[in-house]
A protein has these predicted regions:
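Residue-level preference for the first positions of well-ordered beta-strands
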Residues: 54-56, 80-82, 201-202
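Short, polar/flexible loop-turn hinges at active-site or ligand-entry regions and domain interfaces
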Residues: 10-13, 37-40, 79-81, 106-109, ...
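Core RecA-like ATPase module of SF1/SF2 helicases and allied nucleic-acid translocases
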Residues: 23, 84-248, 253, 257-270
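Short glycine-/polar-rich loops that comprise or flank the Walker A/P-loop
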Residues: 7-12, 52-54, 79, 214-218, ...
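Short active-site oxyanion
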Residues: 79-82, 320-322
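Conserved RecA-like helicase ATPase core segment
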Residues: 1-53, 57-59
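Conserved interdomain hinge at the start of the Helicase C-terminal
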Residues: 58-79
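Conserved active-site motif detector
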Residues: 257-379
Length: 379
């Protein structure tokens, strides 16, 4: 964009009027963004709202801030509410904590860089569409048949909701359905694109996944354990600007000290980790080659199905057969949690995805990789 502005006849025009956020929220954003270097925009944003709103920053000395954030959420006002965290692990912990308190919270789910097109349920739907391919245009009959087969086969899968939402959105934007358009739409999408949080009392998300969304009340849980790079500061700025009316920041660092016109609270309490912790496994947390021996068993599972944990294996609950093996890194991580008094209480299927090694032969078939949730409980 900077280079384009320097082209002959090029001009850089800043849009400075904000009709979305309250005055104090916009003021906080203006104060904070001054700490970000190398920005194209230089003019401060002007709030066109009549609402002052509220900005409150709570500075903690505690390493863990889950409990005070949850307490704060229980006192939330009217309107849509979101909690923004830095990591997926923090987001899942907050989700479990709020659900345990009776709050209908939903997580903006992610596959951590994995393609939505590799999701088991999505793969099956695409195969059903491909089987009826006769021209570049998808016939209405073939489309409805693919929907019926996929929705029926995976009716008990929690992940089917993302496929349903994907199909609905494609139908809304494509009156005539072409194979090429469908493939491009699915290939370029991610799971979070199809997270329907419209009926949630509280939405939980990482700051990274919140871009493009807005909420009346935004709570930010920011642990000061990362280097304050420009990229990180830009993420925090995105988080701040998600708030329409009220912004509440919980932090144990000084990164938000540049915000002036706000309420500040000093909390000297030491808070424990919640009694229940959820760890979401990714590819690096399991031995991928182990799935060569359990493909059919994995494909028979559905998202949210119960698993049993017999270290270092995840087993199919009805049969007890081992279908996944944890990596050494994950075993070491669990050992650290054990020193804090936590043990694996239960496990369940989160996603099943197609995977193939980059070094695999062309004719080698893809594996079905199980990505699970491990629920830890303090003994």
């Amino acid at each position: 964009m900077y280079q384009l502005s320097k082209e002959p006849g090029g001009r850089f025009i800043e849009m400075t009027e904000n009709y979305r956020s309250s005055r104090l929220v916009v003021g906080a954003a203006n104060d904070f963004v001054k700490s970000v270097r190398y920005r194209l925009k230089t003019a401060p944003i002007l709030s066109m709202s009549d609402d002052d709103g509220e900005v409150r920053i709570t500075r903690h000395i505690s390493k863990y801030m889950f409990l005070p954030v949850a307490d704060d959420i229980m006192k939330r006002g009217n309107g849509t509410t979101c909690i923004l965290t830095q990591t997926n692990e923090e987001a899942v912990v907050m989700l479990a904590l709020l659900n345990g308190r009776g709050v209908k919270a939903k997580l903006i789910q992610s596959l951590e860089g994995l393609r939505f097109s590799n999701l088991m349920e999505m793969r099956y739907f695409m195969k059903c569409v491909d089987r009826r391919k006769q021209s570049p245009l998808i016939a209405d009959e073939a489309w409805e048949e693919a929907k019926q087969k996929a929705f029926s086969k995976y009716a008990m899968s929690k992940s089917l909701q993302y496929v349903r939402r994907c199909v609905e959105m494609f139908e809304l934007t494509n009156r005539a359905k072409y194979y090429s358009d469908l493939r491009e739409f699915v290939f370029e999408s991610s799971v979070e694109d199809f997270c329907d949080v419209s009926d949630a009392e509280v939405v939980v998300s990482t700051v990274h996944k919140s871009k493009g969304r807005e909420f009346d009340n935004v709570y930010m849980l920011i642990s000061d354990k990362f280097n304050h790079t420009d990229d990180l500061l830009r993420r925090y700025y995105v988080g701040i600007t998600r708030a329409k009316h009220n912004l509440y920041i919980h932090t144990n660092g000084d990164v938000f000290d540049s915000i002036h016109n706000c309420q500040r609270i000093m909390d000297s309490h030491q808070y424990a980790v919640p009694e229940k912790i959820v760890l979401q496994l990714s590819h690096k947390d399991v031995y991928l080659d182990y799935f060569k021996y359990s493909k059919q068993e994995v494909l028979a599972l559905r998202s949210d199905d119960e698993l049993t944990y017999k270290a270092p294996y995840l087993c199919c609950a009805p049969t007890g057969k081992a279908i996944a093996r944890l990596s050494q890194g994950m075993i070491d991580k669990l050992a650290k949690w054990e020193t804090k008094g936590y043990n694996v209480a239960s496990a369940s299927v989160r996603f099943i995805v197609a995977w193939k090694s980059k070094n695999a032969a062309k004719e080698e078939k893809e594996l079905a990789v199980l990505l699970a949730d491990l629920k830890l409980r303090k003994v």
